[in-house]
Amino acid sequence: MELNQYEIVLVNLDPTIGSEIKKTRPCLIISPNEMNKFLQTLIIAPITSTSKAYPTRIEIKGKETKGWAVIDQIRTVDRRRITKNFGKISEKEILKIKEVLKETFVD
C-alpha cells in the first residue's frame, strides 16, 4: 500500500502504556514521503474525536474522519499496523499542522 505524508490512515496503536493514546484509530502520517517510500515505519499523529483546546491539537475534517490530530502524541509505527487509507487532508490543514510541528519541535 502506498502511503504519503498528510494522509489519514487507520492504525492499530495497541499495546500501549500509561497515558499513550490507544486502540485502533485514525492517524495522520507526519513522516516525509522520502522516508515513507523506503522505510517500513511511519511517523504518525493519532486523531481523537474529542479534545480540549490544547495548542498541540489541530482540528481535522477529512472525508471520512473528523477530529483532532494530537501532535503531543506523535510516534513511529510499523506499516503492518495500518489497515486502511482515508486520503489526504486539505492544504489549509497541512499549513496548520506544519505551523504546530515547527512551533513544537523547532522554535
Residue spans for each PLM region:
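Conserved functional hotspots at enzyme active or ligand-binding sites that engage polyanionic ligands
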Residues: 1-107
